[in-house]
């Protein structure tokens, strides 16, 4: 009897495994089309674009065919712009504070083909987006909002989950000098402020953005009026600090800044290069003319920042 039970158990196991194997011969999910563009905590997908001398760069955005089996046919996916989704995000996150909204990138700064081909036997294709970053003012938060459009002939189905069919690309150009600098060694103070003049103003981090291949800007929240542009003069250690609004904010340099760059291989992971960029001898003044209507508040900053 024990032998009979063993035989029956073996037959049941074989049938179960056979059934499982048969299941995987057929598609378990729809072959939906989606972007590979995971969002961050701000609701957008940050893409870092290396700044070239020409200002032009290419970003390859993956387009996926979901499912448990291989795609067995050629698919032509149509891509379009979706300003409505960007507006919905802005209203949900910032309400009526339009000064905080993400801005749709002007069409002169990008181009991409209307369709992407995904070949039979492949589950991924790429949308090649050509960006021209020349003259792009990073005072605004630029986003390229994309969507997978419905197939005119019904040959594919877009993934209707919001963050799969849509891609809100937050464009972040970078160069060798842009990034987050430590600001603890850059001290500011109020000028002509009486008892409060000697109180130090310190910011632990200073985020800089690329303007071109060798220029960055460091800004406060109201950065349209108070941008500071740092140009690293080629083949020297000179850093030229300027403002494009000095006639209003009274920006003035007291000492010419200089740069120091140190590179060394990591002691533990020798395949990593550690690069430190320092901007030294920073000494400038400016006047805040928007914080308090009718008043001008003068600041002076001195020290070093490093990344």
Question: Which residues make up each language-model segment?
Answer:
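Intrinsically disordered, low-complexity regulatory regions in eukaryotic proteins
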Residues: 21-117, 126-143, 149-307
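C-terminal motif of bacterial Sec signal peptides marking the signal peptidase cleavage site
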Residues: 15-19
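Bacterial N-terminal signal peptides that target proteins for export
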Residues: 1-8
